[in-house]
A protein has these predicted regions:
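A general structural signal marking secondary-structure boundaries and capping sites
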Residues: 13-14, 39, 43-50, 82, ...
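Active-site acidic catalytic loop and adjacent metal/ATP-binding pocket
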Residues: 3, 42, 87-139, 143
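Hydrophobic/aromatic-rich alpha-helical bundle segments in the mid-to-C-terminal region
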Residues: 53-54, 201-217
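ATP-binding pocket architecture of kinase catalytic cores
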Residues: 1-87, 91-101, 120
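All-alpha amphipathic helical-bundle segments outside canonical DNA-binding/catalytic cores
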Residues: 55, 176-188
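Short, flexible, glycine-rich and Lys/Arg-enriched loop motifs at helix boundaries
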Residues: 16-23, 148-157, 213
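Active-site activation/catalytic loop segments of kinase-like enzymes and analogous catalytic loops
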Residues: 137-174, 188-207
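Regulatory N- and C-terminal appendages and interdomain linkers associated
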Residues: 206, 216-236
Length: 236
């Protein structure tokens, strides 16, 4: 016997490369608004005794230091010599922002993990990275250049303007995160994705899961490193 769960079947598409290339701008804006409001709803979930059993809330004062330390440990375990990633980890360690509050975050909220059915969000996938953290961690991940699927001028997930996304988010939360606050979180997002890409490549190399897609994922790392250097070099 083993644990299991039953899910409701949902309709829709999570194909990021198609969603960011929709020709109907009005449709894109409607979808983007729903994406922003769904994230806002998630960030307003409060903890309780049952949630604490499976997802305990960390200390606000140590959450970010612990997250960065975990990334250092993951990179060390990979046994790769990646000076740019090491430099980026040093940068984010010394540039940590003040954390005002911890909310329930998805951890991988991006185009590709959001099911779209016609003009609305029908489901959100891949919750294995969920944890308590700063809301900007989710917002930074969703808007990071590495998750825009080539539509770099559309900061909000490759499908729309940042202000439209945040206005939808603010309608539910009364919180609007200015874009200039995301520099730290964008660098963190790129470092994290680079580490995940190398971990996925290892799964193929170690014969854990033979997959051409996993094998090729590591080739994303140099571009991620270039993005990191570009972001660090941007003037405030």
């Amino acid at each position: 016997n083993s644990d299991f769960f039953i899910m409701e079947k949902i309709s829709g598409s999570a194909e990021g490369h198609k969603l960011v290339r929709l020709k109907d701008e009005t449709l894109q804006q409607k979808i983007l608004k729903d994406i922003g409001q769904r994230l806002a709803d998630l960030h307003q979930i409060e903890t309780d005794a049952e949630i604490e059993k499976i997802l305990p809330k960390p200390q606000k004062e140590t959450y970010l230091s612990d997250l960065i330390a975990d990334l250092y440990a993951q990179l060390d375990k990979l046994q790769r010599h990646r000076p740019v990633l090491e430099f980026a980890l040093s940068w984010i360690l010394h540039e940590k922002p003040v954390i005002d509050d911890l909310v329930l975050i998805h951890g991988d909220y991006r185009i590709g993990n959001i099911m779209i059915n016609q003009d609305h969000v029908s489901g959100i996938l891949d919750w294995e990275f969920s944890h308590w953290g700063d809301r900007r961690e989710d917002i930074g991940w969703f808007t990071a250049k590495c998750w825009r699927f080539g539509q770099d001028n559309q900061i909000a997930g490759g499908i729309g303007a940042y202000k439209n996304f945040m206005q939808a988010y603010a309608e539910r939360t009364e919180i609007y995160i200015p874009e200039f606050e995301l520099k730290f979180w964008h660098i963190l997002s790129h470092v994290r994705w680079a580490i995940i890409a190398m971990q996925q490549s290892n799964r193929n190399q170690n014969n854990t899961q033979a997959s051409l897609e996993l094998a090729l994922t590591e080739f994303l790392v140099p571009q991620l490193e270039k993005n990191i250097l570009d972001i660090i070099g941007e003037k405030e």
